[in-house]
């Protein structure tokens, strides 16, 4: 029987999971088994796993996220029984740990309540990871769960890089630049020296490029500057997010065009970036073949790069 660690990465429309052997040192980078449920909130969700082509999966349309979690749980438990394995702990990617959490932390009810207070700072991601944690706390209260934070890697930022040019009172109230994608950058801080030796310990710029995107400047393998700030809206233009934007434009949308707070949030998070400008897709792979024949697509890609 092997002791395994289950790793969950819960997003707004997908849940990725992986199983790692807990008894191997150093910890393995390649999972024994992994997969994901994708398109959870869409009309045609799919499930895929190691060695299996993704196929359709039926989820309760009233509670699709809980249904997806339960589906993964059932598949993982079945896999465990087949191999005689045992899950000893669950690790979660949690986007926001605020100024408080600079290291992974074991989650209990008090920590969970604390992490819920950061939902307004990461509304696209935080609720879904916490939903999974809460579900497992209820069904398996004795199973250790550990939260690993995307913000933690950026705790090494100098104060001047954390500050927003607002009032000192705002700084003391916690309005500051946190930085994101830290788990990705932390991985690179380990992988780069293995490939490039001491050169990687100098001044390095690392890019995290996906639907969400950011850059991180590292020195001595620590974060010293990053493009994302107070929220995951900041920095580079992204798939559906605007990136850096003159705040006067937001005031104009609300004061002159009379958009509500909810409408502005929907625009900035879900209807901007590549999707907003192209009117076609948030995925560069879908846009590149259309660049020569569609002026909007051409403009979107030009601004993106």
Per-region residue spans from a language model:
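Short glycine-aspartate micro-motif
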Residues: 5-7, 89-91, 146, 204-208
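Short glycine-rich, Thr/Ser-proximal phosphate-binding strand/loop in the N-terminal lobe
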Residues: 5-7, 14-62, 229
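Conserved active-site "lid/cap" helical segment
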Residues: 41-85, 132-134
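Short beta-strand-loop/turn "lid" adjacent to the catalytic site in phosphate-handling enzymes
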Residues: 76-125, 144-146, 153-163
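Glycine-rich phosphate-binding loop of actin/hexokinase-like ATP-binding domains
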Residues: 153-256
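Beta-strand segments within the central parallel beta-sheet cores of soluble alpha/beta enzyme folds
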Residues: 203-207, 262-271
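Adenine-nucleotide phosphate-binding core of ATP-dependent small-molecule kinases
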Residues: 266, 273-277, 284-305
């Amino acid at each position: 029987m092997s002791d395994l660690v289950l790793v969950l990465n819960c997003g707004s429309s997908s849940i990725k999971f992986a199983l790692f052997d807990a008894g191997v040192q150093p910890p393995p980078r390649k999972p024994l088994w992994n997969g994901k449920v994708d398109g959870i909130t869409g009309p045609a969700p799919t499930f895929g796993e190691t060695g299996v082509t993704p196929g359709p999966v039926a989820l309760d349309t009233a509670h699709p996220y809980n249904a997806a979690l339960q589906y993964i749980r059932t598949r993982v438990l079945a896999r465990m029984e087949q191999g005689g394995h045992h899950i000893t702990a669950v690790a979660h990617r949690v986007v926001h740990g605020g100024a408080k959490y600079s290291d992974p932390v074991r989650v209990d009810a008090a920590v969970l309540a604390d992490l819920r207070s950061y939902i307004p700072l990461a509304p696209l991601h935080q609720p879904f990871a916490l939903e999974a944690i809460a579900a497992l706390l209820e069904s398996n209260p004795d199973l250790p769960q550990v939260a690993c934070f995307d913000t933690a890697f950026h705790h090494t930022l100098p104060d001047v890089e954390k500050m927003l040019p607002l009032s000192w009172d705002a700084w003391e109230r916690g309005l500051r630049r946190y930085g994101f994608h830290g788990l990705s950058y932390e991985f690179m801080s380990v992988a780069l020296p293995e490939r490039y030796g001491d050169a990687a310990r100098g001044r390095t710029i690392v890019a995290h490029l996906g639907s969400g995107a950011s850059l991180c400047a590292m020195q001595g393998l620590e974060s010293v500057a990053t493009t994302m700030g107070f929220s995951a809206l900041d920095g580079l233009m992204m798939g559906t997010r605007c990136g850096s934007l003159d705040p006067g434009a937001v005031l104009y949308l609300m004061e002159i065009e009379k958009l509500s707070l909810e409408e502005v949030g929907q625009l900035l998070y879900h209807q901007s970036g590549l999707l907003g400008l192209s009117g076609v897709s948030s995925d560069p792979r879908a846009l590149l073949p259309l660049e020569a024949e569609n002026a909007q697509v051409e403009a979107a890609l030009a601004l993106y790069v």
